[in-house]
UniProtKB/Swiss-Prot annotation:
Chief localisation class: cytoplasm
Annotated S-S bridges: C56-C145
GO MF annotation: an example: copper ion binding
Enzyme class label: oxidoreductase
Subunit structure: Homodimer.
Reactions listed under catalytic activity: 2 superoxide + 2 H(+) = H2O2 + O2
Organism: Drosophila erecta (Fruit fly)
Function: Destroys radicals which are normally produced within the cells and which are toxic to biological systems.
Protein name: Superoxide dismutase [Cu-Zn]
Length: 153
């Protein structure tokens, strides 16, 4: 059974991101577009809460139900919400195209109802040596976010 979800990002960065998963055993395809980004890499994460009452700050930390350190999307030891970076070329829109085998739209670890956050700076993927590298990737301010909702199949 295919599950689809959508996230409308608001803030200084704006856009729409779509999620699609064929079954609980297949990767999630993430696609979309974001505008309002400076020309550089921007951290792109799923955060724990679907709460944007205080802007992006109320979305909490990266979604990390298994208590792991921050890492790259290809790392075994990573938060579920660690989706790496999107690269803005300075032109609007910035394309989002990610395929991830750790996040899911099914079951207890589903990302539906949680928040996508776009950060001002690059995610160092837990390898930067900064005090925030192992928790946030030192990706800087939260410049856009939106709650992931169920979409029509």
């Amino acid at each position: 059974m295919v599950v689809k979800a959508v996230c409308v990002i608001n803030g200084d960065a704006k856009g729409t991101v779509f999620f699609e998963q064929e079954s609980s055993e297949t990767p999630v395809k993430v696609s979309g577009e974001v505008c309002g980004l400076a020309k550089c890499l921007h951290g792109f994460h799923v955060h724990e809460f679907g709460d944007n009452t205080n802007g992006c700050m109320s979305s909490g930390p990266h979604f990390n139900p298994h208590g792991k350190e921050h890492g790259a999307p290809v790392d075994e030891n990573r938060h579920l919400g660690d989706l790496g970076n999107i690269e803005a070329t300075g032109d609007c829109p910035t394309k989002v195209s990610i395929t991830d085998s750790k996040i899911t739209l099914f079951g207890a670890d589903s990302i539906i109802g949680r928040t996508v956050v776009v950060h001002a700076d690059a995610d160092d993927l837990g390898k930067g040596g900064h005090e925030l590298s192992k928790s946030t990737g030192n990706a800087g301010a939260r410049i856009g976010c939106g709650v992931i909702g169920i979409a029509k199949v």
